[in-house]
């Protein structure tokens, strides 16, 4: 009998516990009560009405684009009957970040999130015919698109990416005649911006960024970042693929410089790997050689520095490719604890490539990164020494390759060099240092760009030097 009573008591206790568990939520609101018991029904900040989302328990207050959110006043707060909160009407709150509002009603409570969101009206991306990337100047509110001369600019279809919650006119995906500038207006609440879009058809580009894919938007992030810079900063520049050059679908008759910035996860180590990993460049080598021999210049960075050996720059010796190469994967890029650098070669501090740089402690150093930047350290350099590599000293390297040393690593390796223009052939500038890097997949907290600006300064110097 005693056992039976104990069993009944135990069963009753378990039943009560299960009922309690079923009747309560993580927010201490009984499932037997109305959900409105701890509800924010209305809230305004500085008389700007908040939008209450009951599902996510979020109140979002939309504000003008440049509104000061440091000290906002709760001008209205209406809660469900009998409820109170840790924020009261008339209170001043700092809305630079989201605020938590704790609403209680008797033994019940719910936590809500209060967010101030400035209205934003920006165009982030403007791509024509899914191929040609627009250069956006956010300050001037202009978008510039360069297309090959054969493209019909009277019926181009732009794909436009703009601020969340905004509307854009004309609509994205609708064909437009860009014979004359077209104004795109983005509106989001109190914010509005007008972007003037100019499309220029270029029959004969002045500069070309070359890559292995049909469009620049298909480039890897490192190369795409570099290409985007060129399109925004070098007049009459275009992206072209190696296939375009091989098939001669791009007119290079007025092209002053071809830039190839070649990234490959894990690196490209020497002659044979270059042939294997860049077959598209090998396929176009005859056209590239003709361009070079007719006076065309090259700017070759990272693993693209292998190319001169295949287009006759070093004579018939194909085995003059960089002999000391490595690199990491973009997704696992190394964190820079501080500035990385290489050195200007003795006697070359006055070279045009090194002018106007952001200077550091060492006047002979070329600093290119800052703390908090992630870098793949993709390197294609020449080891110098009698131990291995075929170049006993710098003079031996210059004698065999015909190159001129511009920059060296800490161990004396050749990391930047040029093949000067001669006999009607174009000049070539090469940078194989792992410090020359355009893309960081993320930036650590507190990152401030200082020395990384030197990457774009060096690049602009290279274009100015090669097109003079």
PLM regions and their residue ranges:
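C-terminal motif of bacterial Sec signal peptides marking the signal peptidase cleavage site
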Residues: 19-23
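Conserved beta-strand elements of the Class I
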Residues: 206-208, 429
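A glycine-rich, often tryptophan-bearing local segment used as a flexible ligand/cofactor-contacting loop or short
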Residues: 270-375
